[in-house]
C-alpha cells in the first residue's frame, strides 16, 4: 500500500497540493481525477519522488519514501510521464530494454532478455519490435512505453495521462491493458486521467481533487455520483447506468 500523509507542494508561495492524505489500495487501479490545476500530476510526481516534497510524507510498504535507495525504489515503483521525449532514435525493443536498467545497468542478462521478450509479447509488439518509435502510430508508441514499464517489473505502476493524444479506440485498448496488469499480473496502477467515464469504467478506486485538495476518495459508487462530481468540477452532471457502468453525461 502507498500512504500519503499531509502532502504539500508550493510554487512561489502558492499551494498546488495542500495537506493531502490518502491510502492507495494495493492490487487495484486508482485514478486521480479533477479539473486542470487540481494538482493531480504534481501529486503523482511527489509520490514517485520525481518532485521534491515541501511538507508531509509518502510511505511505500510502510517505509518512508526518502529512506528508499534509488536502486531499490526503481525495482518497486515505475512512472510513465505524460511527455516522453527521447532524443536518440530507438527501436521498440531498445526502448523496452531500458526497463531492465535498474537490474543490469545496460548489460542485459538472460533474465533481462526474458523479461523484455515477455513484455513485448504481452503488449502484442513482438512482430514489430524492430521498428523505430518515430514510425509508430500514437497507440503503438504508447503500448511500447507501457511495455518498457512492464519489463521494469515493479509492483507499483504510475502513469500520468496515459490516454493523452489517443483516439477512442486506442484509449480503450490502453485502459484494457492497464486492467489486465492488475487482474493478471497483480500490479498496483495509479494514473492521472481526464476522462471520468474511463475512470468510472476501469478503476477500482478514485481520488477526486480540486484546487490541490482531496474533495473525496472512494470506490466508483462513492465518487461517480451527481453531488460529488458537481463539487469537484463545479458543473452539472447526470449519471446513467449502462451495462453495469456509471456513465457521466455532462455535454448539455
Indicate where each model-derived feature is located:
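Conserved ABC transporter NBD signature motif
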Residues: 56-64, 73
